Amino acid sequence: MNTPKSIPSGTCRDTPVLKERGQREVFCGLTGIIWLHRKMQDAFFLVIGSRTCAHLLQSAAGVMIFAEPRFGTAILEETDLAGMADAHEELDREVERLLSRRPDIKQLFLVGSCPSEVIKLDLARAAERLTQVHAPHVRVLNYSGSGIETTFTQGEDACLTSMVPVLPTTDQKELMLVGALPDVVEDQAVSLLSQMGIGPIRVLPAPRTAETPGVGPNTVFACLQPFLGDTAAALTRRGAHHIQAPFPFGEEGTTLWLRAIADEFGVDDDTFDRVTAAPRARARKAIANASEHLNGKSVFFMPDSQLEIPLARFLTRECGMEAIEIGQPFIHKGLVGPDLDLMPAGPTISEGQDVDKQLDRVRAAQPDLTVCGLGLANPLEAEGLTTKWAIELVFTPVHFYEQAGDLAGLFSRPVRRRAVLKLEAAE
C-alpha cells in the first residue's frame, strides 16, 4: 500500500495553545441553516429572532421568502422583548399556522437567537410542548444559533446534537457518517466505502426523517466535519464508538480517513488499494497542478470556520506551504488531534480571538496568504495583503479525492491574482 508521508516527531499537538478571549469577528450559528435546510428535505428551521436574523438568512441563502424555503423567522416584536406579550402563546400560534400550511414538514427545529436568549425564552420547554401537540406527525426539537453562544459552523453542531437523544436505539453494527455534505460529495464517500464491503452506512443528518439512523453500542461513527465536538460527545454517551482520523481534505487526509474506517471493519490492504488507487492518483495530479503557486508560500489562518487546523495540515503537507499561525475558534483535540499530529511543530496555534492583537501579528508576519472572515478581508487587501474568504471553504465542495484539486485551487487563485497584479503594475 502507498503510505502517506511520515509523521513528524515533534508535532503541533505538543505546541502550547495561545488562548485569546477578546473581541472576535465571526458569523453566528444561524448561518448553519443555509446548508442544513438544503440537506434535510422534510425539516423546517424556525428562528425565534429579530428582523436582523431574518435579513441575514434571506440574504445569505439567496432565497426569497415567497419561494417558501425550509426556513423562516418568527419575529420578536418590542412587546415580546418588553415582556408585554406571552411569547409562548404567540409561538404556539405561529407553529400551528406554519404546520397547517406546510403538511410536508416532519421535523421542526425551534432555533434560538440573540434576542430569544436575552429574554430567556425557554425553547426547550416549547419544543416538548409542541411535540406533544403535533406528534406523531411532527417532531419538534430546539437548539441555539445565537451569536452569544455559537460561532458560524457551531450551528450545525448544535442542531445535530439536539437530534441525538431522539435517535432510535439499534444493536446492529453500522457505520454512521456525521456531518452535512453536498449530496454529490456524500455519494462519493459512500461509494468508496461500499466498494470496500463496508456497510450498512447511515448518515446524520439524513435527508428525510424516515431515514434517520439508529445508534447503540455497536454503532461506529466518523465525523465529516471538524466542528462537531458536541455531536460526537452526545453519540458517545449513547454508546457509539468514534473513529478518530485526519479529516478528508486532500489526498492524504482522505486516504487516512478511509483507512481508519477500513481498519475498523477489517478491510485488507489489497481491497483498500484496489478501491482507492485511481482516485488517489487523480487527486495527487490535481493538487500538483493547482498548488504550483502555493509551494514555498506562507499562510496565516484567522479563526472562523473551525476548518483551520485540517486545512493547514493539507496546505503544509500536500501543497508545500508554511503555516505561520493557525487560529481556530475552538480546538477540540478529540477531533482535530490526528491532524495536529501530522504537522511539525513551528506554527503558532491559537484558540479564540482578540482581533486587534491578531491583526497586529498578521501585519508583522506579512504572510503570502491570509485566510480570514469577510469583514477583515477587504481592509487587509487594502493594506497589500492577499486574502482568502474562510466562508468559501464552507460553502464549496472540498472533501474527498475528487474535490482535492478544487480545494488547492481555492487557495492558489488569490495568490496567482496578486502575482498578476504585481506584474501589471511593474509594466
UniProtKB/Swiss-Prot annotation:
Enzyme class, top EC level, equals oxidoreductase
Cofactor(s) required, per the database record: [4Fe-4S] cluster
Pathway info: Porphyrin-containing compound metabolism; bacteriochlorophyll biosynthesis (light-independent)
Annotated [4Fe-4S] cluster binding sites: 28, 53, 114
Name the Enzyme Commission number(s) assigned to this protein. 1.3.7.7
Catalytic activity as recorded in UniProt: chlorophyllide a + oxidized 2[4Fe-4S]-[ferredoxin] + 2 ADP + 2 phosphate = protochlorophyllide a + reduced 2[4Fe-4S]-[ferredoxin] + 2 ATP + 2 H2O
The record's listing under InterPro entries reads: LIPOR_BchN/ChlN, Nase/OxRdtase_comp1, Protochl_reductN
Can the keyword Nucleus be found in this entry's annotation? no
Q: Which Pfam families match?
A: Oxidored_nitro
The superkingdom of the source organism is Bacteria
Question: Which molecular function GO terms apply here?
Answer: 4 iron, 4 sulfur cluster binding; ATP binding; metal ion binding; oxidoreductase activity, acting on iron-sulfur proteins as donors; oxidoreductase activity, acting on the CH-CH group of donors, iron-sulfur protein as acceptor
What is written in the cofactor note of this entry? Binds 1 [4Fe-4S] cluster per heterodimer. The cluster is bound at the heterodimer interface by residues from both subunits.
Biological process according to GO: light-independent bacteriochlorophyll biosynthetic process; photosynthesis, dark reaction
Show the disulfide pairing: none
The alphabetical list of record keywords is: 4Fe-4S, ATP-binding, Bacteriochlorophyll biosynthesis, Chlorophyll biosynthesis, Iron, Iron-sulfur, Metal-binding, Nucleotide-binding, Oxidoreductase, Photosynthesis
Q: What does this protein do?
A: Component of the dark-operative protochlorophyllide reductase (DPOR) that uses Mg-ATP and reduced ferredoxin to reduce ring D of protochlorophyllide (Pchlide) to form chlorophyllide a (Chlide). This reaction is light-independent. The NB-protein (BchN-BchB) is the catalytic component of the complex.
Self-association or partners: how does it assemble?
Protochlorophyllide reductase is composed of three subunits; BchL, BchN and BchB. Forms a heterotetramer of two BchB and two BchN subunits.
Identify its protein family: Belongs to the BchN/ChlN family.
Q: What is this protein called?
A: Light-independent protochlorophyllide reductase subunit N
Recall the taxonomic lineage recorded for the source organism.
Answer: Bacteria, Pseudomonadati, Pseudomonadota, Alphaproteobacteria, Rhodobacterales
